[in-house]
């Protein structure tokens, strides 16, 4: 991509996209990756987020621009009262920008240090959890849950912001430059689950449990008036390895939480959220909502499955959002009910029946998973790994980083797929759809 210009937008200036012309009212905030402005068109007020593309190294710009566009796509695609909605996207002198909902009620950081009764605390948590649920239902993991990314509209409804883009960049910097990057990159580390920041586990599949962990840390901070379970940020910066060891050993300050909680159920919730092992945390957002006393949202009835149903896997998150793999057509063309999934190798594009593109990460194995169609119940089953020959020995070999379905790990014995299920393979999520 061409070199972006270093720009600053002044109050009163105009920003034009293909859809509209906006007037800049004032600057709302500035960070290392970009700036946010309050803007208006002829009728409404919005927020405009501009990336400082000129601050990135040339080899980083393509990835960042792609991730930024993904965040816009997520925000424009998902209709939820608990997620900041995206309305417009364009470029300004080589710097991408998006136009979003304007949230005038501040963010959750503004409430840290205040005292809440049980009802008010539950209401705040409910809105955050509903936003996470709506993201997870679409196969999107936020991966950067912290108070600054929980905004409030003028009705004090919490809304999730900054999903997808900053987490991706920060996570990569954190792993690649573990001891020497800017404070802004590392600020997320105190909320991150161990598997996100540990280089030995960084390539493992990330599912809803990633956000569950960060939610637990954030609620601990809110309840205790600004404390963090494993110690303050300065301790993290002073000795990251020691801080991460405390996460691993689950050595956190329960006393502060017990003393501060308006309801002791929060001790139970947070204790489970910040378990070291992902499988020991809550598996779904609905489980936390249930503990809080909220009835699970009634899901739409799953469509009936028939022998003639056409099964599709749709990419929800990854390099090729929106791409669809037609399982029924692939099965018929192969005359086989067994399909393989793995990393797309451009030098050998027919290694798998379904090759998943992965340009900036290395999560997907060459031979990652297997889909098998059952003529008995007309459903597909997914198994981790593939039957193949390795070092001259035939056998079933599992993938390096695993497969998740609805946030639960799948082994080689397989799991039955249902319409609406979310499959996570590496950093890519696929939604099961039938026509």
In which residue ranges do the predicted regions lie?
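Protein kinase glycine-rich loop
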Residues: 25-31, 36
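C-terminal boundary/linker segments immediately following FHA domains
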Residues: 341, 377-379, 383-384, 389-435
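Intrinsically disordered, low-complexity acidic Ser/Thr-rich regulatory segments
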Residues: 286-363, 372-377, 418-419, 428-435
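AlphaC helix of the eukaryotic protein kinase fold
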Residues: 58-77
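Activation-segment/catalytic-loop signature of the eukaryotic protein kinase fold
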Residues: 89
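Activation segment signature within eukaryotic-like protein kinase domains
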Residues: 124-125
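Protein kinase catalytic-loop region centered on the HRD/HxD motif
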Residues: 130-140
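Conserved short submotifs of the Hanks-type protein kinase catalytic core
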Residues: 93-107, 111
């Amino acid at each position: 991509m061409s070199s972006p210009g270093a720009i600053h937008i002044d109050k009163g200036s105009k920003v034009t996209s293909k859809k509209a012309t906006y007037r800049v009212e004032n600057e709302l905030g500035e960070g290392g990756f970009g700036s946010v402005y309050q803007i208006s068109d002829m009728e409404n007020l919005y927020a405009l987020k501009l990336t400082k593309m000129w601050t990135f190294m040339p080899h980083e710009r393509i990835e960042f621009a792609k991730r930024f566009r993904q965040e816009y796509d997520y925000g424009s695609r998902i209709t939820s009262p608990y997620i900041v909605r995206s309305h417009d996207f364009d470029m300004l002198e080589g710097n991408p920008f998006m136009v979003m909902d304007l949230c005038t009620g501040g963010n959750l950081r503004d409430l840290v240090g205040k005292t809440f009764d049980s009802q008010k605390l539950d209401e705040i948590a409910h809105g955050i959890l509903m936003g996470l649920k709506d993201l997870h239902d679409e196969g999107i993991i936020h991966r950067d849950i912290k108070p600054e990314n929980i905004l409030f509209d003028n009705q004090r409804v919490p809304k999730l912001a900054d999903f997808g883009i900053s987490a991706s960049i920060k996570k990569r910097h954190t792993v690649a430059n573990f001891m020497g990057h800017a404070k802004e990159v590392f600020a997320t580390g105190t909320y991150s689950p161990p598997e996100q920041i540990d280089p030995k586990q960084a390539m493992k599949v990330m599912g809803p449990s990633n956000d569950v962990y960060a939610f637990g840390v954030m609620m601990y901070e809110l309840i205790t008036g600004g404390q963090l379970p494993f110690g303050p940020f300065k301790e993290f910066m002073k000795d990251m390895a020691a801080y991460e060891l405390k996460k691993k050993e689950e050595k956190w300050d329960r006393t502060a939480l017990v003393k501060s909680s308006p309801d002791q159920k929060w001790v139970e919730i947070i204790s489970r959220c910040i378990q070291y092992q992902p499988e020991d945390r809550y598996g779904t957002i609905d489980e936390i909502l249930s503990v809080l006393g909220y009835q699970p949202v009634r899901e739409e009835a799953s469509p009936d499955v028939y022998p003639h149903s056409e099964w599709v896997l749709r990419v929800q998150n990854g390099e090729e959002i929106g791409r669809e793999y037609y399982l029924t057509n692939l099965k018929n063309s192969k005359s086989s009910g067994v399909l393989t999934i793995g990393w797309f190798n451009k030098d050998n594009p027919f290694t798998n029946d379904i090759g998943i593109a992965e340009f900036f990460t290395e999560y997907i194995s060459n031979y990652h998973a297997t889909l098998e169609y059952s003529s008995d119940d007309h459903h597909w089953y997914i198994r981790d790994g593939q039957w193949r020959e390795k070092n001259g020995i035939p056998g079933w070999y599992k993938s390096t980083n695993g497969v998740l379905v609805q946030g639960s790990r799948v082994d080689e014995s397989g799991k039955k797929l249902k319409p609406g299920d979310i499959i996570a393979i590496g950093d890519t999520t696929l939604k099961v759809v039938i026509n």
